[in-house]
Amino acid sequence: MLAYTTLGVTDFERANAFYASLFSIIDVGHVMGNERIALYGTDVQNPMLAICIPYDEKAPSAGNGTMVAIRAGSRAACDELYAKAIALGATCDGPPGERVPDFFYGAYVRDLDGNKLCFCQMGAN
């Protein structure tokens, strides 16, 4: 259903480096973009995450209650993505752990611009 989700950033180069390094863990890469937007995914036919300098050139803001959940593929990958994000300068918004017994495992961070991300594994690992 979703084609892509966009997060506004304050420093495009810094954010691009953050997401490129972070997503290398789950074999997700830069699939398209230009000088103000970069889209990450496996290809343009699958859901992507975009980062951009807002088109109106006003300051971006992280939404209260807004979060992007990234399917990690395993609990170990959730842990690895979380650790990598923290090492790259993200802040903890909920350490890795089981949130719904035997079904949902997640780890939460705020990226360099305060956008909330969840690295998750749903179902059996």
Where do the PLM segments sit?
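Short glycine-enriched loop/turn motifs at secondary-structure junctions
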Residues: 1, 61-64, 101
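N-terminal beta-strand motif that seeds the catalytic metal site of vicinal oxygen chelate
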Residues: 1-16, 68, 123-125
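Core segments of cupin and vicinal oxygen chelate
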Residues: 7-49
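Conserved active-site tyrosine of GNAT-family acetyltransferases
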Residues: 15-19, 85, 114
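Charge-dense, helix-prone N-terminal extensions
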Residues: 21, 25, 81-89, 93
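Short beta-strand micro-motifs in enzyme catalytic cores
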Residues: 38, 66, 103-107
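Long, continuous compositionally biased terminal/linker segments
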Residues: 41-80
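Vicinal oxygen chelate
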Residues: 86-125
